[in-house]
A protein has these predicted regions:
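C-terminal anchoring/interaction modules
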Residues: 1-20, 24, 288-534
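Extended, helix-rich architectural segments
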Residues: 1-183
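Structured, contiguous alpha/beta core segments that scaffold functional sites
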Residues: 8, 139-302
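An N-terminal domain-start capping segment
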Residues: 29-56, 112-113, 182-213, 299-321
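Long, contiguous amphipathic alpha-helices that act as assembly "spine/axial" helices in icosahedral shell
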Residues: 55-58, 62-63, 100-142, 253-288, ...
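Short, mixed-charge, low-aromatic patches
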Residues: 57-68, 76-84, 94-95, 220-226, ...
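Flexible coil/linker segments and helix-coil junctions enriched in charged and small residues
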Residues: 87-91, 181-192, 436-440
Length: 534
């Protein structure tokens, strides 16, 4: 069975998910998942929704997930030495040196990601995940590429593990550069030709080889394998990343966030259409003139603003819709639905009041962030870990970073759920310290709280590396000793000055005492000028 036939067979199981994704896309971002699969998208056929709430919440949630998964100012992972190997094979004293080297490697990896188009493609994939629930990312040599749900099919086992992926894309004949049949020579039953004669359909088949345990993929065009298109990759570092937003046991495809709240979106769409059309009808001004009136309709039509015409007021009337109460009911319901949708997509709505404290805004924001926990769990497993493994493999193969021993070094994800956990730890720690300071006073806080341990825990909660930033206990003790020595020397100099002013140190009466005092002053000054020993 060739790739085209395999794609068509697996597409039957995708149809129900694709239809639901198209419905969700039509209410939010219609251009994400279009109705036409065989030709290039024609945006003239896209229907614009009557409301923009769906588009707003999708874009906002995608931006939040983007910043949480790949934060721009920090790393989303940490390279750490396995604790069970640290005591056996590595000297614990070199732990700080390893952390410093790992931090340099982490910055190199983040610089590589920042210089690429990864964030742009990942943001696009997140919008597909929120709307359609599925997305496919290919990590190629030239960067990342996103496949929407109508361009790929996937086959999974009962546990959700990927067994097979088949993609379909339109590629220009000039780009392929192969000896392809001319337009019109293909068979009428051959679906590899598209409506555009310059484009051909190329299928990519991705399978997991059971014998070698590696991913194998190749491309076909006109049911023939394209020469040089066969490639392989390790099982844990595949460039093909099929992503899901929500999973259901036994289903090959995921469910999107929009599908969970599509009822409110459909209701808001209907109410918005009714309000817009009703408001347009109510805004239309039509005058009625009594047939027995002496005032002619032409007189009213031709009268300018502020003009004076002859007539009786009761002969002229204005048509009124009289649906103000009905419009108010629909508008109130639309506002309630919009508020529910904003809460569902984690869009913060601050209470409209004269006095809204910063603490209330902070608690609202923290409550919204806690709702991201379930979303992060699946994205961490299906996206961040495979994405990091593939990036490490690419950089190690190109010798941009040194090869890391897998049995000693283990990368760990610190973004997503872990970042939310650290944020809660920071919040609890600051509240605990603040409560002690307010109830018992600053003196009790300094007496019972260990400052160095509190600083370390705050830095760990915020994901800050304290290496060479926070002073160690040895450095603090050394500085205290230096301060004590300087204080003692200063006291000795002051005492010597007081003794020098006494009558017993008069050179005319006691010459030997003056010489001894001079030697003590010189010795104290030399000790004070000596640099501190490290």
């Amino acid at each position: 069975m060739n790739a085209r036939e395999r794609y068509n067979r697996l597409a039957t199981g995708r149809s129900q998910f694709l239809d639901k994704a198209r419905d969700c896309s039509s209410l939010t971002l219609p251009y994400l998942i279009t109705q036409d699969d065989n030709t290039r998208s024609n945006h003239k056929n896209l229907i614009t929704p009557w409301q923009s709430v769906g588009a707003k919440v999708v874009v906002t949630l995608a931006a939040k997930l983007m910043l949480a998964l790949l934060p721009p100012q920090t790393t989303f992972f940490k390279l750490q030495v396995r604790d069970d190997k640290l005591g056996e094979e590595l000297d614990p004293s070199i732990r700080s040196e390893l952390d410093l080297s790992f931090s340099k490697i982490e910055r190199m990896i983040m610089d590589y990601i920042a210089a690429s188009n990864d964030r742009v493609v990942i943001h696009q994939a997140l919008k597909h995940l929120i709307v359609g629930g599925n997305a496919l990312i290919f990590m190629g040599k030239d960067g990342l590429k996103n496949f929407p749900l109508n361009r790929f099919v996937v086959n999974r086992d009962g546990n959700g593990n990927v067994l097979e992926i088949v993609t379909k894309e339109l590629i220009s004949r000039k780009v392929l550069g192969l000896d392809l049949p001319e337009p019109g020579e293909e068979s009428a039953n051959d679906s590899s030709k598209s409506s555009n004669d310059d484009d051909v359909e190329v299928y990519t088949c991705v399978k997991l080889d059971e014998k070698s345990g590696r991913w194998v993929w190749y491309q076909e065009c006109f049911d023939k394998i394209i020469p040089g298109s066969r490639s392989t990759a390790p099982k844990n570092a595949s460039p093909w990343l099929p992503l899901r937003f929500n999973t259901v046991d036994g289903e090959d495809y995921g469910r999107g966030r929009v599908e969970e709240f599509i009822g409110d979106l459909k209701s808001l769409e209907g109410l918005s259409q009714a309000l817009v059309e009703g408001s347009a009808a109510a805004a239309k001004v039509v005058f009625l003139v009594s047939p027995s009136s002496t005032t002619k309709p032409q007189t009213i039509a031709q009268a300018g603003n502020g003009a004076i015409v002859q007539g009786r007021p009761e002969d002229v009337a204005v048509i009124q819709v009289g649906k103000t109460a009905d419009f108010a009911t629909a508008a109130n319901l639309a506002q309630q639905i919009e508020r529910r949708i904003s809460d569902a997509f984690l869009t913060m709505n601050v209470r409209q009041a004269e006095r809204v404290t910063a603490e209330e805004v902070r608690l609202t924001q923290m409550e919204l962030e806690q709702q991201l926990g379930g979303i992060f769990s699946l994205l961490t497993v299906e996206f961040l870990i495979p994405y990091l493994n593939r990036t490490l493999l690419i950089l190690q193969r190109s010798n941009q970073i040194p090869k890391l021993p897998k049995d000693l070094v283990r990368p760990s994800i610190v973004a997503g759920v872990n970042a939310l956990g650290r944020g809660q730890d920071r919040e609890s720690l600051t509240q605990f310290i603040g409560t002690i300071a307010q109830t018992l006073g600053p003196e009790a806080l300094m007496h019972f709280i260990n400052p160095s341990e509190a600083i370390k825990r705050l830095a760990a909660a915020q994901g800050i590396d304290v290496l060479n930033l926070v002073k160690t206990e040895e450095q603090i003790q050394q500085e205290q000793q230096q301060q004590q020595q300087q204080a003692a020397q200063q006291a000795m100099l002051e005492q010597a000055g007081q003794i020098a002013g006494s009558p017993m140190m008069d050179p005319s009466k006691n010459p030997e005492g003056t010489d001894a005092l001079g030697e003590q002053i010189v010795e104290a000054q030399e000790q004070q000028q000596e640099p501190p020993q490290e």
